[in-house]
C-alpha cells in the first residue's frame, strides 16, 4: 500500500505504483487523469476554468484545461510515459446551482468538460471513461496499478470507471 498523493484545486501531480492520486470536491471543476497503462505512470490535474487566454490572472497553468493538460503531459513524459500510449479518464464538470439562463459564462462545468475534451482530442489522447455533468460534486481517486478511477459522491454509490 503506497501513499495517497493529493491534488488540490488548480493543482496537478504525477505518480507511479504503489502510490495513488486523488482530488477532492470536484464541482464545476474537472479532474483529468492521464496515464500510460504499460508503464503505469499517471497524473492528475484539477482544472477550474476552460481557457487561460480569456483570463488576465492566468499564471497558474493548472487552473485551466488548455494549459494544465499540456503541462501534465510534459510531466508524465519526464516520469517515463510514452506519448503515444497516454489515455485519459475525466470526472466533474457539474452544474452545481440551478438557474434558468442562457448566459454562457454561467455554464462553467459544461464549458470545462467541452474544453477538456477538445484539448485531449487535439493531442490525440483518447478518453477511455468519464463521469461528468449532472448536479453533484465528486471526489476521485486513481490507482495506476489497476487503472481504476474511483468516484465518490455524497448520497450516491461509489463507482469505478
UniProtKB/Swiss-Prot annotation:
Any single biological process term in GO: chemotaxis
EC number: 3.5.1.44
Signal peptide: none
GO molecular function annotations of the record: protein-glutamine glutaminase activity
Domain of life: Bacteria
SUPFAM superfamilies given in the database record: CNF1/YfiH-like putative cysteine hydrolases
A Pfam family it matches: CheD
Keyword Transport recorded: no
Catalysed reactions listed for this entry: L-glutaminyl-[protein] + H2O = L-glutamyl-[protein] + NH4(+)
Keywords noted in UniProt: Chemotaxis, Hydrolase
InterPro entries per record: CheD-like_sf, Chemorcpt_Glu_NH3ase_CheD, Cytotoxic_necrot_fac-like_cat
Family named by the database record: Belongs to the CheD family.
Function: Probably deamidates glutamine residues to glutamate on methyl-accepting chemotaxis receptors (MCPs), playing an important role in chemotaxis.
Protein name: Probable chemoreceptor glutamine deamidase CheD
Source species: Lachnoclostridium phytofermentans (strain ATCC 700394 / DSM 18823 / ISDg)
